[in-house]
Structures are given as C-alpha cells and as structure tokens.
Amino acid sequence: MTGVRLATVELPDIGVPVERPELPVERYAERVEGLRARAAEAGFDRLVVYADREHSANLSFLTGFDPRFEEAMLVLGPTGTPAILVGNECWGMAGAAPLPMERHRYQDFSLPSQPRDRSLPLSEILAGEGIGRGSRVGVLGWKAYDRPDRIELPAYIVDELRELVGPTGSVTNANALLIDPADGLRIINDVDQLAMFEWASCVTSSGVRRLLGGLRPGLRESEAVGLLGWNGMPLSCHVMLTAGPRATFGLLSPSDRPIERGDQFTTAFGIWGALTCRAGFVVEEAAELPDGIGDYVDRLVGPYFAAVAEWYGALHIGQTGGTLQAIIDRHLGDPFFGIFLNPGHQLHLDEWVNSPVWPGSTVELRSGMAMQVDIIPATGTPYFTTNIEDGIALADETLRAELATAYPEAWARIEARRRFMADALGIDLHPDVLPFSNLAAALPPFLLRPDLVMTLA
C-alpha cells in the first residue's frame, strides 16, 4: 500500500445542470444510414432489431423509441422508411418517435390476454417488408456470440425468419454492427451523446454523494434509497441498496431493514448513460469495524485504490484493453480479491454494452468511447468489498474542443473533476480522459465519514 493513505478531503460542489442535453432529431436518421452502410458491407440486405423493456438500447439508439410493457421490433432495409412492429400499448408512442417509421400493430407483442384481433401474422408483416427467399437477414438484440447462428431473440421470431429466407438465405447474429468493442456504431459516441452521458453521471453521482452524506444508523434501507433523489429518468439497471448480511449479494433491492452501525453496505444508481456505485462499512473509523478486519483499509481498500489509480493513469486513446487488464492482475491478482469480471467496460444507454478489457486484448481505446470504471472485488470473506465505480469518456483534441464549445458548462465540470483528482487524490489523467462523475474517484471506506477518502496525493 506504498503511497496510499486516508486523508480528509473536501469534495468540490460541482452540482447537477438543470436541463438535460437533447440529441438533434436528425441524429437518428444519420444513425440509421450509418447502420445501413455497415449492413451492406457485412452482406446483409435486411436487419431486424428486437427490443424488450430491459434490452431496448439498440432500438432506442436508432429510433428514439423504447418499448414500455411489451416488445418491439425494427425492420430495416437498404432504403426507404424503417418499419416498427409494436403491440397495443406502444402504438401511439412509436408514432411520436423522432425517427419516422412505418408502424405495424403486431399484437403478440402485447401483454397476455390483451386483444389480438387487429394484426397480420408475423410472416406476412415480415414478407411485406422484403424478407423472403434468399434474404440475408442480420438480427440484433443485445448480445454477440462466437457462433453467428446463435441468436438471443424469442425462438418463434427466429423460426419465422428462417422459414421465410429458406435454404438459400441466412439469418445470423449482427449485434457486432452496433456493439463490437473496437468500433461498434454505438461504441463511438458523438459530442451530443457524450454531453447527455455527462449530465446523467452528474445525476447518479450527486445522488450517491447525497446518500453518503445522509447515511446514519437507524435509517431504513427503504428510507436511505430516497436520498438518491431519482428524477424519473429511465434506469439503466434496477436501484441497488443493501446493508448487513444481504449486502454480500450486491445486486439486491432495498428492504425495510434498519441500517446498523458496523454493517457492510453497498449501493448502485444507474440511469441511461451513467452508473455510480460505492461500497464499504457503516462506521466512522477502523475501531468500529467487525472483529477480525481492523486492517480492512490496508488489506483491501489501499491495494484496490492503488490499482484503480494506475488504471486511470494508463487510460488514453490507443491504449489496449490488455494493458488495463494486466494492471489489475498485477495489483489484485491474488485470489483474496476475487476479481473475476472485466476490469472496465463500455457503457451507453445500457449499463454494460461491451468490454475491450480482457487478458491479452489488443482492442485499442478510441476517441468517443464512454467507459465505466467497474472493478469490483468479491472477497467472499468478512472483508466484504470496496468499490469506486464511475463513468469517464475518451476524447481526442478535436472532440474535446467540440465539447468545450458546444457545452461549456459541462466542460467546466470536467476540468474541475480533473483538478480534484490530480490535486486531492494524486491521480493524474491523460488529456484524453474526461471524468463524468461528481464523486470523481473519491473512495471513503468508512461511510459515516464520506470526507475521509483514499489518496495518493
């Protein structure tokens, strides 16, 4: 833990902008044309983009429409107006999407026992959109697989597609067009999308900061979660907050259990484009920690912070995912730390789009990528965990200038975070790295002292 210490630090009050940046309406048509070009290069003559409530990011990225209560499916040909299949409840909402679409009411996407008397069979709708014998159909849901014939859509849709194209056609997984970790269309973001993500990170990180400032023994989990101040924006994952024995599982929702002094504690708050997470113990000092883990900071938090600080410092355009993985392996490779997921991944409207980080990865980081600092120890011991999960983006000189010009207030917040990380925490960032979180790598292991954080300064 050389160079790492606990210190009292004053977090800058960066705040949350009142208005959320919006994408220009024409951006959706531009994205569709970009996807059409990639589809043609890959040999597809039709694309099918499927969405349900949890997996709507691809569809929302392309159309500005995400289904509520039911599923939806976009059919995209090489030219013409895209077609959208929706159930009963999304009919009106799809018609108001920023991307003009030809709507088809497909009532099997509706909830159970709702009317199903006003839609054509799926095969007729798809055939009417140009899918037939010999068609080469690319299918997008939310996962790419090593085998292109593996498709995560409901079987009845895939069966119908394969029946329509016949033995001379093909139906294959095309998710890489949007989410390939090196150059997927949804992996490389423009300035307006990054500004939206910065706003989202202001919301989630300020919420977690407010929670840490108001955390106290006796507060129920269900009361504590209200401190996050969720503003109604669509969530990128369910809200997580647990204390005590249940916190071990990490992913659970809050209960009515009162939070007790000495509890282990974790919370995560994510909306489209951002997620912020912190974890530690509900104490003010090491003397209040549970028996046997008085060295919690030295054994776990200090090495973890040193690893994440080096990971941050290694970020720049052109860096490889394999190098980032090697940093974490060198610091936290001991089985005690229990690191088993990719140490870092890309994010978008969905919390985890893909990851360029794995052992030996030669995928290079690029300008426009939005990344999540997601490095989570799972010790499986009384030491529990620690977490410093925040969002950043990578931007070359041109994109940085564009952001500073178009969104000067966001740029000022980014510069304030960079100064805080360098001056207060001792984390020097490459100019390419834009921190989006108002917590800006602040890691308090003793959660009743949110001003007492790890630092290299």
PLM regions with names:
Residues 1-457:
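Active-site neighborhoods and metal-handling regions in enzymes and metal-associated proteins
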